[in-house]
């Protein structure tokens, strides 16, 4: 079992049950980087804070649902790339998650956003068509595995 550390900071009034996110981190990191240490920071914030982060890091003056940072991207890769440690930060705007949840519960939408953000943190992307298909496939796979118990 890989050592996975998930640190969650919630700056909002939203009452967060961290166990589903812990389970998701264990499954995704354990599957994508078996045996690699994973350190994941999650910040749950509001629109105002996200707008600042989005402006600071991406140059966009608006809120967004999630920002992900692969902090290990600059680390030297180990001989077995899958064993390279994972360091990522994920910022989630709970107000935006609420607005876009549609028929999902807030917890379900939060899980979907967390899965998306964590896959980015692991180096997956959806800019190029081939990458987009791979990331979408992985998102669907993990949603199917993890969403059964999320109400």
State the predicted function of each range.
Residues 1-111, 119-151:
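An acidic/histidine-cluster motif and surrounding catalytic segment
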């Amino acid at each position: 079992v890989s050592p996975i550390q998930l640190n969650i900071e919630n700056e909002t009034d939203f009452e967060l049950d961290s166990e589903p996110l812990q389970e998701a981190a264990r499954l995704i990191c354990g599957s994508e980087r078996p045996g690699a240490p994973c350190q994941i920071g999650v910040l749950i914030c509001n629109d105002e804070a996200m707008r600042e982060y989005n402006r600071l890091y991406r140059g966009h003056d608006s809120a967004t649902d999630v920002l992900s940072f692969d902090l290990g991207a600059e680390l030297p890769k180990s001989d077995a790339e899958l064993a390279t440690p994972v360091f990522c930060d994920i910022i989630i705007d709970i107000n935006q998650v609420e607005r876009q949840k549609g028929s999902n519960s807030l917890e379900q939408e939060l899980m979907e956003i967390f899965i998306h953000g964590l896959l980015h943190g692991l180096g997956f992307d959806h800019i190029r068509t081939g990458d987009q298909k791979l990331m979408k496939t992985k998102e669907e796979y993990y949603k199917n595995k993890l969403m059964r118990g999320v109400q």
